[in-house]
Amino acid sequence: MSEKEDIHVEETAKNMTNGGNAAFHNYINDFAHIEDPLERRRLALQKIDEASFGWYHVRAIMVAGVGFFTDSYDIFAINLGVAMMTYVFWKEGQIPSSTETLLKVSTSVGTVIGQFGFGILADVLGRKKIYGLELIVMISACIMQCVIGSSPAVNFAALLTFFRIVMGIGIGGDYPLSSIITSEFSTTKWRGAIMSAVFANQAFGQVAAGIVALVLVEGYKDDLKAAKSGSTCGPSCKKALDQMWRILIGMGCVPGCIALYFRLTIPESPRYSLDMELKAAEGVTDATKFVPGLNGQDDIERLQSNPTAVVATTQEHPYGESSGASESPVRVDVPTEHTPPKASFKDFCHHFGQWKYGKILFGTAFTWFCLDVAVYGLNLNTAVILNAIGYSGKGSVYQKLHDTAVGNLILICGGSLPGYWFTVFTVDIIGRKPIQLFGFFILTVMFCLIGFDYYNLSGKDLLGLYIICEFFQNFGPNTTTFLIPGEVFPTRYRSTAHGISAGCGKIGAIIAQTALGTLINHGCKKNNKPQNCWLNHVMEIFALFMLLGFLTALLIPETKRMTLEEVSEKYHDEVDPSKYRSSHVQNSTNSDTSSSTVEQV
């Protein structure tokens, strides 16, 4: 092997990165033999952006979607699990309302921490180093919840709350990571559908939790039927319920264990990895630009099959005259300041401190905040809706748990599940912004109807409005608030900005549960009114938040069928580095020429 070939092999090995599996292909290594980092970046990203939808993308959806499956499974399971564990750990099967709220809010508190923390870390340390750690946190916390108990030295509720906060941190970390990784590995044409399908795993998680709960209730039916109430739940009944809630919550970590290998072996995102490589090579004094429209898919195939191939191009003269075929890329002097600045807190504040950029972050964060406030509003009506369809949860312990599981399954399949998948099939056709705006508009109208006409609505009327709200919540802002932040920000801040947006959403959910949720009984006892007497006014407040979400969504740009680099260039004024080529890289047909020479067309 000649010295030149030895050098080429060494350079190729130096450019290769670790990782890669059946779900996330290592695109960087496909072009490791390309010496120019800018050209290597261009070819790798072009292959990702122009790829046809295939089983590779389906596997990526499954691996990235596991976190959201676990998230929704856990939230649904804890609602059913609390109903089970109340008979075991609290007298008469009555859990204090403050304790119940604490258990349910604790996950959201942890989620906020995870969203902010992991979002920043993924931009600082890289996607590969972080992805999988949040799933390990989720799995570990899930297992710990299943084995805790009560003793004179340990408060059961406090310990369970602690592990739910820990689990929330893992769940929160999955939001920015799964979003941006899916976004950066997806083909441009179907990126919205792929990201929406990842998020739609939430619906499958809810359905799975309902099915597991129903199977457990039927499996322990003989132990539960004899108990007509919490006071008559004997030792065998309590033992059955204690086993049931532990199995129900513990089953949530099974999908995560299966997907953990794929997350830990993921390659670094080509966009992040190659951008960091460019930052390290910023000592290059000038760059040369490729003629737009050249070096297409055929070039990728030729370069992969023959590392030493030189791509012939037909150049267009600046004045329209054809200059014929050329064996070298066309190069034009370009100032180095086109390279995006290095990520830092100072640059982050400077960039988003400008309204034309900051309004996008404000838009994604505040729309998510408004949405999550109102999502809790739908949950306030669940008991009324279940009663309307005959699943009020009255009667024996068995009947209560059975009705709760079946009733919630009906509501999920009636509204949430179709809504998610309508978004998957239409988001790359209709666009993100129209779906988000229309969803907020419909939710505003529906909440107004429920709020201002609440006492004139029958149970069936509420059921219809509830299903419409569930449908347009998911065929609307619930999906798009997750999707848009994963696309609309530049690579160096994509994870951080997504984490901030998602964190603001969960803060909205916490406020709704702790503050607005208590308003439903405002003045009820004092004025001798029935329970939930102020629910109609609370729904009116939620309608206002939906209107604010609609108005704020106008600040967010459309990203349909645009590459991530085109989005950054259009909305953040950042020139795509892939358009340039370092002048220090010698052309294969003129290797003896000085590396600092730049030819201008």
Where are the language model's segments positioned?
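Transmembrane-helix signature of 12-pass secondary carriers
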Residues: 2-601
